[in-house]
Amino acid sequence: MTGMVGTILRRKAEQNMTDVTIRNVTKRYGALTVIPQLSFRIEDGEFVVLVGPSGCGKSTLLRMLAGLEEISGGDLLMGADVINDRPAKERDMAIVFQNYALYPHMTVAENMGFALKLRKRPRAEIDERVDKAAAILGLGKLLDRYPRALSGGQRQRVAMGRAIVRDPQVFLFDEPLSNLDAKLRVQMRAEIKALHQRLKITTVYVTHDQIEAMTMADKIVVMNEGRVEQMGTPLELYDRPANIFVAGFIGSPSMNFLPATVAATNGPLLKTPEGVALPIDGGPTLTGRSEVTYGIRPEHLQLGETGIPAEVVVVEPTGSETQLYVTVGGREVVAVLRDRVDVRPGEKIWLTPRKGCAHLFDPNTGARIAG
C-alpha cells in the first residue's frame, strides 16, 4: 500500500483507537436549552451521519465537537481523553463546510496546503502531501487554478483535499453537498463514501437529507429537538423505526400513518374510524389496547383485488415507478408502484400491504408497538 492512503493507515495503526464519545452533553443559550444531556458513541473508523430537521441541534453538536462552540455541560471524549477545553486547532479534527470556505486569492494547491503552512511544515512536505491528496481526489490538473475558475463539485473536492492534507484523526462534514445540484450530489456522496472506505478515518457527517444518510452511513443518529430519537444502521432504522418520528423521517416518500381501533375477534382486527379494515399479520400483542397508529411505507403497497379501498387523486409516473396519491377514508396515502399501471384520478382501487411490512405505534407516545 503506497501514497497518502498508506501513510494515513500506518498512522492510525500507530495511534490509539479514535472513537468519539458524547457523554451527557448539554448546550444552552442563556435560559434556552437546545441540547439536553445528549449521549452516544462513535466507534473508531465509523462513518456516522447526524440527520434531522432544521433546528434539531445536529450542526450545533458538530460545532461543539470541532471546538467552534463551547459545551454547557457534560463531556466530549476522543478515545479516553476529555477534550472539552482543548482549542479547536489542537483537536486533530478537520471540518468541511457547506460553503467550501476557500480563500479566493489562493490557488487550489495553496488552499489545500494552508493549514500545514500555518504549522510551519517544510515546503517539500507540504507539496508532497498536497500532490498525494490531489491524486486521490482527481485534482492534479487543477492545482494552479483559483476557486473562481472551479465548478461547485471541484470546489467541494478542494475543501475535502484540504481536510485530507491535515491527516486528522476525525473528519467532520457540515452539510457539504447542500449547494450542489441533484446530479452532482449523487456523484459527490459516492466519492465521499469511497474516500472513507479508503482512508478508514472516523467521520461525523451532518445533513438534513435522509437519502444522504441512508446511502452513506455506517450508523445514523436521528435527532429531534436536541435529542437522539434512534441510533442504528440504515436498515435498522428503515425496518424497525423506534417511533413515529423516525418512521416518518426515514424513507422517501414518508411512511403512511392511519389511526386505527382494535377489535378482538379470532385475532386482532384493525379499522380506521371510518370502518376501513387494515390488514395485519404476525399476531402482534395488542392486549388491552383500543387504539393504535397503523404505518405502512408507500413502496410496501401494491395494487390488488382486495385489501384497503382507496380513491386515486394524483398519478405521478417517473418511468421506473409510479407514485399514486390516494385517499383512504378521507386521509391522504401515497403508494409507490414498480410496475406501470393504468389508473386515473377519481378511480376506485384496492391497495394490498406487503406481508410483514406493517408497523404499529402507540398513538399517545408515538413509540413502536409491533410490526
Swiss-Prot record:
One annotated GO biological process: carbohydrate transport
Q: What is its main location?
A: membrane
Q: Which Pfam families does the annotation name?
A: ABC_tran, OB_MalK, TOBE
List the PROSITE patterns hit by this protein, alphabetically. ABC_TRANSPORTER_1, ABC_TRANSPORTER_2
Q: Does the keyword Chaperone apply?
A: no
* GO MF term list: ABC-type transporter activity; ATP binding; ATP hydrolysis activity
**InterPro entries with a match to the protein in the record:** AAA+_ATPase (IPR003593), ABC_transporter-like_ATP-bd (IPR003439), ABC_transporter-like_CS (IPR017871), ABC_transpr_MalK-like (IPR015855), ABC_transpr_MalK/UgpC-like (IPR047641), Mo/tungstate-bd_C_term_dom (IPR008995), NA-bd_OB-fold (IPR012340), OB_MalK-like (IPR040582)
UniProt topology in membrane: Peripheral membrane protein
Q: Where is the ABC transporter domain?
A: 20-250
Q: Which residues bind ATP?
A: 52-59
Which subcellular locations apply to this protein? Answer: Cell inner membrane
* This protein's GO CC annotations: ATP-binding cassette (ABC) transporter complex, substrate-binding subunit-containing
Q: Keywords on this record?
A: ATP-binding, Cell inner membrane, Cell membrane, Membrane, Nucleotide-binding, Plasmid, Transport
Q: Which domain of life is it from?
A: Bacteria
Free-text function comment from the UniProt entry: Probably part of a binding-protein-dependent transport system y4oPQRS. This system probably transports a sugar-like molecule. Probably responsible for energy coupling to the transport system.
By sequence similarity, the record places it as follows: Belongs to the ABC transporter superfamily.
Q: Which protein, by its recorded name, is this?
A: Uncharacterized ABC transporter ATP-binding protein y4oS
